[in-house]
Amino acid sequence: MYDIVDLVASDPRCLSENDYCTNQTLFYTGDMMKITYINHSGFLIETKDCYYIFDYYRGELPHLDKEKEVIVFCSHFHEDHFNPQIFEILDDMGMTYQAVLANDIRKRNHLSDRKITYVYHDQTYNLDNGTEVDTLLSNDSGVAFIVKTKEGTIYHAGDLNDWYWDGEPKADNQRLTSAYRAEIRKIKGMHFDAAFVPLDPRQGDHYADGILYFIKNVDSNVIFPMHYWNDASVIKRFITEYPQYKSRIKNTECTKGEEL
């Protein structure tokens, strides 16, 4: 198991109310993968030869080594998970890149002159750099990603979550829960070096339903809560209410030097 070490973090109170925390926390998984939280559900993972960017929405990227290729993953078309500006940013940085996009993005965006693999759920894709990508069906939109690299295996949920909403019909909530659990059962017992899972405060008392089911069924060295809409208090709430999982949960918006 890799050691996960907080490297750099800044106080989220320094951010404007219109910004998500940008590049403010770095994590190392040993000497193999460096993980940078960009914003919302967006993360940058650096390996020896490649960068992986997941669900870029907004925010600046750190300096990137032009000798490394970038692979851009977008789980679905929602604007808080897919922003085509990421390609302009990478062009301006002089980076070589390719993209792995959920098929629902192709229907709504015309992206020409890009190296793109459009993906469907429950499929396996082998990229030309040796990365293997498996997909799950999101119970909201698009897919979730399982990305297997030489350095480790990554899970990014996109919008696959136990979306229980107060005030919605009971049957709808039950359907979403059943669909979520069916997908997670497909990866039951699988090992991930890093997992990125929604923890959405808008769900009220059901905010942790999805991440709890994931933790109890899937083995991951470390789990990064995401999709919390700039309300980092939900991470501390989870750690407080479920201290038994504290060692596996990374607070992407913790202050410098805070031990979790």
Regions found by a protein language model. Name each.
Residues 59-62, 78-82, 105-109, 141-143, ...:
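Active-site environment of divalent metal-dependent phosphoester hydrolases
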Residues 58-104, 185-196:
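Active-site metal-binding motif and surrounding structural segment of the metallo-beta-lactamase
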Residues 179-185, 204-213:
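A short, acidic, amphipathic alpha-helical segment used as a generic capping/interface helix at domain edges
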Residues 65-66, 84-87, 112, 168-169, ...:
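Short amphipathic alpha-helical segments
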Residues 53-54, 73, 154-157, 196, ...:
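Structural motif
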Residues 27-67, 115-191, 253-260:
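Core dinuclear metal-dependent hydrolase active-site scaffold
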Residues 2-51, 241:
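Zn-dependent metallo-beta-lactamase
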Residues 33-40, 109-125, 141, 207-260:
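Binuclear metal-ion centers of metallo-dependent hydrolases, dominated by the metallo-beta-lactamase
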